[in-house]
Regions:
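RNA-binding accessory domains that recognize and position tRNA/RNA substrates
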Residues: 2-244, 256, 273, 371-373, ...
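Short acidic-glycine loop/turn motifs at beta-strand connectors
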Residues: 22-24, 138, 314-316, 357-358
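Short clusters of small/polar residues that mark proteolytic maturation junctions
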Residues: 32-33, 70, 302, 355, ...
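Proline-centered loop/turn at the N-terminus of a beta-strand
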Residues: 121, 206, 278-280, 296, ...
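Active-site glycine-centered loops adjacent to acidic/histidine catalytic or metal-binding residues
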Residues: 127, 283, 326, 367
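Cysteine-nucleophile active-site neighborhood
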Residues: 247-321, 327-332, 373-391
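Catalytic beta-strand/loop cores that center a nucleophilic Ser/Cys/Thr
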Residues: 318-359, 366, 396-397
């Protein structure tokens, strides 16, 4: 008489084809998705509910493994238009729930297939709340994410890869993600349901954007405000930038340690400030501008990443809900006297915006272009436009 096969719990019998190994040897197991392989980076978390395609394609995430705190990621698939850069620099992604079939009229490809195409290692079915709590309590750790259909992993080797990696501190990633060739932005505006990404051929001002890892939605907003934008690599000299005859300079977002990028970027910015041109910086651009003005930066314990960060505008005495993505900050102690703090975080009172007292120069730590996120701070683009208008009028008089 043959014995009946014992029923097994399908959930428990599932092979763990994905692992995340942290530097303290803590191992999280799940189901691998995307690209089969392994990748090492800093493990961070993002609290956004939407916009995963824009987040993953943001160059500022170079060198990082993103843990998404919202449980359902991938529901709307991916499309051909919403990339924030042409190349994906994110090291890996971690999701709580299995990706469902996409349901959206703009969807072109399943998120799993998109991750595979872009060689991004991912895991689903992982306890993202536990991982988030760990990061919150201990700080953002180094980690190695791996996916193998066999479910066989050399944990010792993965741990070794994790501990050997130097981390983001003192790492210049802007030089890796910056454009290899200067170019003029095509002029596409921000997305509208009725028109999609419509092209704008008008140009009232010429902005030169220094690319430390620029997001496309920043360029789209400049098109919304009738600006022609020339994007230059992060090591382009001030003299070469000035030959382009810009009305204003934009310092972009980007990944890595601002102090490391500052080794070449600070002198470029100092020379541009001397020319009294309007300057506007976002995120890494904000940090490098602060360094050029004599301030200092430091690595944060876990950083700010999400689309719901409240920021106090100290000039207008109001609160803006902002989109953020940064792991370094400007140190608020012993700021040079010529720097005025304009915005601060209502989470931890860290500096979120500065301006130079005697010149048309300002920057913010957060992302006014959102994508994803609220649009409370789009007015900053208008302030930059106003500075260029005033500067042009002054030159004519």
């Amino acid at each position: 008489m043959t014995k009946k096969a014992k029923k097994t719990n399908s959930k428990n019998s599932k092979i763990h084809t994905g692992v995340l190994v942290l530097e303290n040897k803590k191992v999280f197991k799940g189901i691998g998705i995307g690209y089969q392989g392994e990748a090492t980076g800093e493990v961070c978390f993002n609290t956004s509910l939407t916009g995963y395609q824009e987040i993953i394609s943001d160059p500022s995430y170079a060198g990082q493994i993103i843990n998404f705190t919202f449980p359902h990621i991938g529901n709307v698939g991916t499309n051909k238009e919403d990339h924030e850069s042409d190349k994906i620099w994110t090291k890996g992604v971690v999701f709580n729930s299995e990706i469902t079939s996409p349901s959206n009229y703009r969807s072109f490809q399943h998120l799993d297939a998109w991750l595979k195409k872009n060689k991004i290692v991912g895991i689903t079915g992982l306890d993202t709340r536990s991982l988030t709590n760990f990061i919150r309590d201990k700080g953002a750790p180094k980690g190695t994410i791996a996916y193998s259909k066999t479910g066989k992993f050399n944990i010792s080797k993965l741990t070794n890869s994790t501990t050997k990696w130097t981390g983001l501190k003192n790492l210049d990633l802007a030089e890796k993600v910056t454009t290899s060739k200067n170019y003029i932005w095509k002029g596409f505006k921000t997305w509208k349901k009725e028109t999609g990404y419509k092209k704008n051929n008008k140009s009232s001002f010429h902005v030169v954007a220094i690319d430390y890892g620029i997001k496309k939605n920043i360029l789209r907003y400049f098109s919304d405000f009738n600006c022609k934008v020339t994007v230059v690599s992060c090591k382009t000299s001030a003299d070469k930038i000035l030959t382009l005859k810009p009305n204003g300079i934009f310092l972009s977002n980007g990944p890595g340690d601002p102090a490391a990028t500052g080794k070449y970027a600070i002198n470029i910015i100092k020379n541009l400030i001397k020319k009294n041109l309007p300057i506007f910086g976002i995120c890494l651009g904000h940090q490098i501008l602060a360094l050029a003005l004599g301030a200092k930066t430091k690595k944060m314990k876990l950083g700010h990443r999400g689309a719901n960060h409240p920021v106090k505008n100290l000039i207008h005495d109001n609160v803006e809900i902002t989109s953020q993505n940064h792991g370094f900050e400007v140190i608020k102690e012993n700021l040079p006297k010529n720097i005025e703090v304009t915005h601060k975080s209502l989470f931890d009172n860290s500096i979120e915006g500065i301006r130079l007292k005697n010149k048309p120069v300002f920057s913010v730590q957060y992302h006014p272009e959102s994508n994803p996120g609220p649009q409370d701070s789009v007015y900053l683009f208008q302030e930059f436009i106003n500075n260029m208008k005033k500067n042009a009028k002054k030159k004519r008089s």
